[in-house]
Design a protein with these regions (language model features):
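Active-site core segments that coordinate phosphate-bearing ligands/cofactors
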Residues: 1, 10-174
């Protein structure tokens, strides 16, 4: 381990320390405010959504994370196959946190929009261009809903940034 890194790890329910007098003064805050340790964004999103045993929370953005928790006694020594994360205390103290989801979600929509919009780059006036862009995915969604599912149609997988679940593999593409 590099000498400048810490040798201990802490779960997200512990504090790293307290706000120093210098920073309290600079920020206009009282001294002694707790400073949190680092935590995973999706895990803290689940906390904000009131995750609890038996409740699945879905955090959606560039990717998606499906977060659940279970008591240690319920999990025992089992490791859940296919998910990308199972960590003691990663979401709530005293519980095992489970994470699954998609490596690509919102960024697929951004990429798709960019791919479809390249022809619009020469339209003068940002307002007209924006109006077309705003309606594009809405119209494509409407048309897709009218299509009948087919087992011999084109398949697109959400593996643009690798696969988070099932069986995480960040090198797979589809």
């Amino acid at each position: 381990m590099l000498p400048h890194l810490f040798t201990e790890t802490h779960t997200s329910d512990s504090k790293a320390g307290e706000l120093t007098p210098e920073w309290a003064d600079r920020l206009g805050l009282p001294q002694g405010i707790a400073v949190a340790v680092g935590a995973l964004d999706a895990h803290m999103g689940a906390v904000g959504a009131s995750v609890a045993p038996g409740i699945l929370t879905r955090i959606m953005g560039t990717s998606t994370c499906d977060i659940m928790v279970a008591g240690k006694d319920e999990v025992g020594g089992r490791c859940i196959k296919g998910i990308c994360g199972q960590v003691d205390g990663s979401v709530l103290p005293g519980f095992i946190g489970f994470e699954a989801g998609q490596s690509a979600f919102g960024d697929i929509y951004a990429w798709f929009r960019k791919m479809l919009a390249w022809t619009l780059k020469d339209i003068p006036g940002g307002e007209a261009r924006q109006k077309v862009l705003d309606g594009m995915l809405v119209e494509l969604t409407r048309e897709a809903q009218d299509m009948e599912p087919s087992e011999d149609g084109v398949v697109a997988l959400d593996w643009m940034n690798g696969r988070r679940t099932p069986d995480a593999d960040q090198n797979v593409k589809g």
